[in-house]
Amino acid sequence: MQHDVYDYTAHTVSKNTVLQKTYRLLGFSFIPASAGAALAANAGFNFYAAFGSRWIGFAVVLAFFYGMIHFIEKNRYSNTGVTLLMVFTFGMGVLIGPVLQYALHIADGAKIVGIAAAMTAAVFLTMSALARRTRLDMNALGRFLTVGAVILMVAVVANLFLGIPALALTISAGFVLFSSLMIMWQVRTVIDGGEDSHISAALTLFISLYNIFSSLLNILLSLNGED
């Protein structure tokens, strides 16, 4: 009996340690992300414009995004994985830099960026709290999120051809919902012991928060009359 209690306690401590390390690494990951965004915004660097074609730029972004995720996951238990995560977040900061530069140079732009950031933080805190209490089937939610990810990617590619503003807003709203659920799923998976790598968990949470912030920023800019 004592042995069973010890095993349960040790397992609980282990899961809590992974979650704590995940949150800590997630916080650190925003340092290079902020540096990348500030660098790109101050330098006026536009990644897509640098290639002279949005298609080439889009392909390079996809290669960077999924390539880095692959290498981070391959090193998910080592310090190399942490280093690669920092490189990844810096790169993602560079990508969002031009949007921030644009937003900060329009009327009420700083306020809009602040609102998007505050709403993102609120979503994260809310979904993290819900993850501790939810009774949802995480396997079913995981399957739903997989289907949702495919639908969103198809919609993104389709709108590159169509260029419909209303569809772009719908996609942004979809990313907010999808990423919010992803936060809850990832945190709950760590709590349940289904994820033992704080690097992988932090990566998922960073991408989710990045998507929420950028999507909310797009929505708020559109509501403010800015395309």
Swiss-Prot record:
Q: What is its main location?
A: membrane
Q: Name one GO biological process term.
A: regulation of proteolysis
What membrane topology does the UniProt entry give?
A: Multi-pass membrane protein
Q: Which domain of life is it from?
A: Bacteria
Which controlled-vocabulary keywords does the entry list?
A: Cell membrane, Membrane, Transmembrane, Transmembrane helix
A GO-annotated cellular component: plasma membrane
Where, by residue number, does the polypeptide cross the bilayer? 25-45, 49-69, 80-100, 111-131, 144-164, 165-185, 201-221
UniProt keyword Transmembrane helix present: yes
Localization per Swiss-Prot or TrEMBL: Cell membrane
Which ranges of the sequence are coiled-coil?
A: none
Any single Pfam family the record assigns to this protein: Bax1-I
Give the residue range of the signal peptide: none
GO MF terms, alphabetically ordered: calcium channel activity
Query: Any idea what this protein is called?
Result: Uncharacterized protein NMB2020
Q: Which organism is it from?
A: Neisseria meningitidis serogroup B (strain ATCC BAA-335 / MC58)
